[in-house]
Amino acid sequence: MMSNTTIYPSLKDRVVFISGGSSGIGAELVRSFAAQGARVAFCGLSADGGPAVVESVVAAGHAAPYFEPCDVRDVAAYQALLGRVGEKLGAIRVLVNNAGRDDRHAMEDVTSAYWDDRISLNLKHYFFAIQAVAPGMAAAGGGSVINMGSVSWMRGRPNLAGYTTAKAGILGLTRTLARELGARNIRVNAIVPGAIVTERQTALHRDPAADQQFLDAQCLKIRLDPGHVARPTLFLAADDSDGMTGQHVLVDAGIAQQSVIS
């Protein structure tokens, strides 16, 4: 898996926490950081999926990551989990805010409670995770936060208003906290994935016609997979990117440009 991936010496033994690590992009992030020799911890919404990711890491010859199920919408429980990770593994030096869901919803069907839930699931926990880990990160000499965004809001994707609003907010959060935390040597950047092929997307939303639409809209005629997202995430986590903060890096094969030129 890692044969064509750069090795970053600064990530060896570094404590990394990834939310939403039980499947899709998150699972690939867990495997990729473990292959760098990092000390990885992650959470998923339920106990399902997490143990299989741990087993895949061990089978590849790397140290077993630490996993706990957690609903990131429960801020108190989530911050308590982050505290336990810090006590067990040491100060979290890399935080990857990844958990979220792009459930489709027509505007007419959205209730106030559903809207609040979408924001809670796709944005709110990012802030409170950073709030929880920043003191320890700063005391350890600094660190890196990577927020996972989405190109969907840049393209104005329909039937996703709660999701796209939250994902647009991630850019504002990233830039504000990059300014606020820079004096503590904490960098805050965002990765903005495009049409990534994951198990969930394939099961719910992808078919040959949809795949072709994405390819037609992309500058690069390739199928993006979680590895395309993991590789630049490793770079932003490593000391090699220590001059970068407040940035959003698109990993979308150029699909965002389609909304500009069409």
Which residue ranges define each predicted feature?
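Short C-terminal tail/terminal secondary-structure segment
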Residues: M2-I7, R155, L234, T245-S262
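Residue(s) in the substrate-gating loop at a strand-loop-helix junction
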Residues: S150
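Alpha-helical segment proximal to the catalytic Tyr-Lys
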Residues: P135, R179-A183, D242
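Substrate-binding pocket helix/loop in short-chain dehydrogenase/reductase
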Residues: A106-M107, T111-I119, F214
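Conserved glycine-rich Rossmann-like NAD(P)H-binding loop of the short-chain dehydrogenase/reductase
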Residues: A38-A52
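Conserved glycine-rich cofactor-binding loop
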Residues: V15, S22-S23
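Active-site helix of classical SDR
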Residues: I130, A166, T174
